[in-house]
């Protein structure tokens, strides 16, 4: 005697339906992919970026509620942006800023200060301005990295930022509670920024990573975006650092 089993289709509501997500640095790469993922989950999007033309294309592509072109590392412009935001924001992701590589002993100290200030001050300024804008249970998500955990010539500034951001994140999570604060630490991600940094060496780097990474493929912006949206929707997550590097930190890659 056989028993027929009927499998019914269970509809799932979008996890960010009706929620407002701000992506600072949302015109390309990880930021734009996160915006796409959040849009699929029903979020209303507000994007920022430096390039007006690129930002306009990105905002149109994800049907953003609004967009604002400015330099997020400029405290005055950042403060004005937050002042103009609606009072009810659910999530903010910050992907602005870029890595800096160079030998410490050859580095102009004034430039080194600017690079460090760009990373730390940006996150602190975002947190300060967002404190009265983000709903309880919402989250700030910052982007960091895993590559600087392994010492190497030319990685001095990157390493300093890498090890400091988790502590900054944890302390902000306590200060801003019940708003949640989390950090995503990525390794190599196959973005336009990576292509611009590597130039003709990009394909060699991809091949090297495919051979050495435990996952046997290169991490894509969609991988990071999936993690970002998970952090937004899981309200138990705060003060933590989440690695998404395909195991890069465990191998010589």
Language-model features: locations:
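A glycine/serine/threonine-rich, flexible loop-to-helix segment
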Residues: 189-212, 253
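Conserved Rossmann-fold SDR core element
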Residues: 166, 175-190, 194, 237-244
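Conserved glycine-rich cofactor-binding loop
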Residues: 27-28
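Substrate-binding pocket helix/loop in short-chain dehydrogenase/reductase
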Residues: 103-104, 111-116, 205, 209
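Catalytic loop of short-chain dehydrogenase/reductase
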Residues: 115-116, 122-125, 139-177, 188-189
